[in-house]
């Protein structure tokens, strides 16, 4: 037991520089994660463009896009502050748009490669951008629509490929490459920049 314990301590000590580097990397990433005040004039990323917020009073909370403007209505009857209402309405709009977009892209790609998806849904997950179940359902992180369109297309190609290959084998990556030839560059982009793709709640 003593030898095993010494070996374990030695292994942990050897890995300490790697662990410290990862912790520093995470701290740096957290420092550059976006923070929004959810005020009129603020610009939010959406696919290949930016949307400008226009916040105004209404009878109830709502969010409507008109060209490159998001009109957000807040309710004076709500107990939440105006920025809190705005953040909530914006998140609901993004989530609904993500579901609409990802359902369409997934179905279109499935049709073109002869695969069947039994359902698409979206969530705000912390660790994964997408997930394909063994029964053919695909789940996406809705915040992927904060990324450029080619990155979104790569993610869809990745998850649709899992409908045929439920692993990350060579055959899987060959399938991804066949429908998204530039997948390696886009995969690296998502790995390196994914921490920026977030619409956080309002923080005072």
Language-model regions, residue ranges each:
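Walker B catalytic acidic pair
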Residues: 159
